[in-house]
Swiss-Prot record:
Protein name: Cytochrome c-550
Disulfide bonds: none
Any GO MF annotation of the entry: electron transfer activity
Keyword annotations from UniProtKB, A to Z: Electron transport, Heme, Iron, Metal-binding, Transport
Organism: Novispirillum itersonii (Aquaspirillum itersonii)
Signal peptide residue numbers: none
InterPro entries named among the record's database cross-references: Cyt_c-like_dom (IPR009056), Cyt_c-like_dom_sf (IPR036909), Cyt_c_1A/1B (IPR002327)
Translocase keyword on record: no
Post-translational modifications: Binds 1 heme c group covalently per subunit.
Length: 111
């Protein structure tokens, strides 16, 4: 993916997420450092019970995992938890594969 293009695509995510170090939590957690911290570790953010259950089972925010999550957060959590009723606060899906790859490349620069 192209991080510069991803930064542009990620602007649409800015309604719910901040991207700068120390940025405020919004409807969603701050995404700065997402690829270097564990899931559910954004300070001060109250994750959904399903997200917490998935995080407790263990996974890392690598490119493949981010790809699965931003494709369909609900399906991702259902698969991780084994609970078909699992739900997340994030309902937005990034439909275009090239945009997902670009956003993931951008997120990887936020360290």
């Amino acid at each position: 993916g192209d991080a510069a293009k991803g930064a542009n695509v990620a602007k649409s995510c800015g309604t719910c997420h901040s991207f700068e170090q120390g940025g405020a939590k919004k409807q969603g957690p701050n995404l700065f450092g997402i690829t270097t911290r564990g899931p559910g570790k954004a300070e001060g953010f109250n994750y959904s019970p399903s997200y917490k259950a998935a995080a407790a089972k263990g996974f890392a925010w690598d490119a493949a995992t981010l790809q699965d999550y931003i494709t369909d957060p609900t399906a991702f959590l259902s698969n991780k938890t084994g609970d078909a009723a699992a739900r997340d606060k994030m309902t937005f899906k990034l439909a275009k594969p090239d945009e997902r790859a670009d956003v993931i490349a951008y997120l990887a620069t936020l360290k």
